[in-house]
Amino acid sequence: MDESHTIWIEKYRPAKLADIVGQDDIVERLSSYVKSGNLPHLLFTGSAGVGKTTAAVTLAREFFGDSWQMNFRELNASDERGIDVVRNQIKEFARTRPAGDAAFKILFLDEADALTTDAQAALRRTMESYAKTCRFILSCNYSSKIIDPIQSRCAIYRFRPLGPQAVKEEITRIAAREHLDVTPEAMDAMVYIAQGDMRKAINALQGAAILSATIEAPMVYAITSNARPEEIGELLTLSLSGDFDGAEALLTRLLRERGIAPNELINQCYRALTKRDMDRVLKVELIDALGETDFRLSEGASSDIQMEALIARFVLAGTRKR
């Protein structure tokens, strides 16, 4: 395949455990399994884009070498949430003997928290029955959604969101390989958008690179449909100063002209509020309003009405505090 058409998150996916950035403690502990030649069942938990899938794939590569693809299988539980996927695909893979001289195989089940409770119970029985021939690596965003009998059978690894420095180092490395010039402001924009998710940062870089070899902040915000932090600050200032018309005009521009998703705008407002120096009681009231609006949107309420109502609540709250 022409590398110019390759998705960068795959092109630059680490091939070794040691190449994974921002998860040094986890990498060290996983490497110790490779040295020992043995592996327990594992549960990887953490938000998206922090290296869970990469850790599973590189671990299999280092355990099995050239035969890793024959002894490793990846399934996504969100595709098939029911018990049939456990009875059929998972059990069929787990029961067969490993290829070559491998002592066991590895089955990586991504988004395991999407499995129903009954499916998880069946999975637990499968993990017990075929522990000699297959090790399971489960990945999830929320470990609380994994039943206790599975958690107790796994070594649990909590992947934290990647820090700004880790994101910057990876973006700098990729930019050098792709002959891109990334301005400091654009780098800060990608860190802001990523929120610890390396996939988001790399996708933003690739999207911007299609437009120009010189990456600047405005194009990063534009292609990712994010408001600039200063725009969010202006929206809050207008609302809290009582300027409903000004806040409404800016809200309309962000949602309709720029195409920013309402839930993304709520997330950006929340991030700005948590860092804003302001009356604590007022901050609590505003965050409560954000949470209620986010919930109503998730329930299918009209986004136009809910976002207008949110601005109205901000204006009223700011007016009461003046």
UniProtKB/Swiss-Prot annotation:
It comes from the Archaea. ATP binds at G46, S47, A48, G49, V50, G51, K52, T53. InterPro entries: AAA+_ATPase, ATPase_AAA_core, DNA_pol3_clamp-load_cplx_C, DNA_Rep/Repair_Clamp_Loader, P-loop_NTPase, Rep_factor-C_ssu_arc, Rep_factorC_C, RFC_lid. The keyword DNA-binding does not apply. One of its GO terms (biological process) is DNA repair. Part of the RFC clamp loader complex which loads the PCNA sliding clamp onto DNA. Belongs to the activator 1 small subunits family. RfcS subfamily. This is Replication factor C small subunit.
